[in-house]
């Protein structure tokens, strides 16, 4: 369709519907809030004159219909990550569609494809972020400089392992448990070499795995009245926290058993 039409025909309506669903999926799988996904999709539908549009979003799925139930679509979103650059790009596209700056579905589809292709930060940036975050958290929790250095090394190792898991499709609880175990092992070895306590380094480095976003968004969903999505996110956060505890506890228990002393 060359221009935005007041009464798009059936083929155009289907195309608009597919575009809106793709935009919602992009938002949801990159860390946007549930209510924000619904709001953005409704704005796009109204701007493209897709009448009687209704959408219901969960943390892992989108259900939408348009017209008198003549069109309906379901999208499964099993994979969720955090890429706020893509979220911001889709939100900006939504505002431009509403203002008329993006006036055709062709341009909107092109812009959405560009937003979906925004890359993640380079590997060295993620490694540096893990190193800096672990170092700072170790100091915040009362560790000395030696503990901070051990935590920094563990942070690099953890992020390198997470990058490896991402490229080979390793996910779920196993990834979190194994990463927490790797962090604990690296901190114990590093602190033993440097002659300092391992507890501050372990706690500081484990903070980079803490599900803060999932927990915060779960609370926000509850505040918004979406109890189902809030419950799902809270359970997700609790499972991640439990996986972290299992991984760290296994290594510390094994170390204490082998050495005959408690890890401090």
Where are these regions (language model features)?
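Cytosolic regulatory modules rich in charged/polar residues
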Residues: 35, 107-121, 173-174, 199-204
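Core alpha-helical transmembrane segments of integral membrane proteins
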Residues: 119-199, 211
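Soluble N-terminal domains of membrane-associated systems
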Residues: 1-102
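N-terminal charge/polar-biased segments
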Residues: 1-16, 118, 245-264
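Generic detector of multi-pass transmembrane helix bundles and their immediately adjacent loops
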Residues: 190-264
């Amino acid at each position: 369709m060359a221009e935005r039409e007041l009464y798009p025909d059936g083929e155009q309506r289907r195309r608009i519907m597919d575009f809106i669903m793709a935009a919602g999926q992009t938002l949801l799988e990159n860390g946007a809030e549930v209510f924000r996904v619904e709001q953005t999709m409704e704005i796009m539908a109204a701007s493209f004159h897709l009448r009687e549009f209704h959408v219901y979003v969960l943390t892992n799925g989108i259900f939408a219909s348009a017209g008198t139930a003549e069109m309906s679509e379901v999208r499964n979103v099993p994979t969720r990550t955090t890429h706020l650059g893509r979220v911001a790009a889709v939100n900006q596209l939504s505002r431009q569609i509403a203002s008329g700056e993006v006036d055709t579905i062709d341009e909107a589809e092109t812009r959405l494809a560009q937003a979906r292709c925004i890359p993640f930060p380079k590997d060295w940036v993620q490694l540096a972020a893990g190193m800096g975050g672990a170092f700072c958290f170790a100091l915040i929790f009362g560790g000395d400089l030696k503990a901070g250095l051990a935590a920094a090394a563990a942070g690099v190792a953890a992020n390198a392992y997470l990058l490896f898991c991402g490229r080979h499709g390793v996910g779920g609880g196993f990834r979190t448990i194994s990463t927490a175990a790797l962090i604990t092992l690296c901190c114990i070895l590093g602190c033993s070499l440097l002659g300092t306590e391992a507890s501050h380094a372990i706690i500081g480095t484990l903070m980079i795995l803490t599900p803060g976003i999932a927990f915060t968004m779960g609370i926000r969903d509850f505040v918004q009245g979406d109890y189902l999505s809030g419950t799902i996110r809270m359970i997700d956060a609790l499972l991640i926290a439990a996986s972290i505890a299992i991984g760290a506890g296994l290594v510390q228990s094994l170390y204490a058993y082998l050495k005959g002393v408690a890890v401090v």
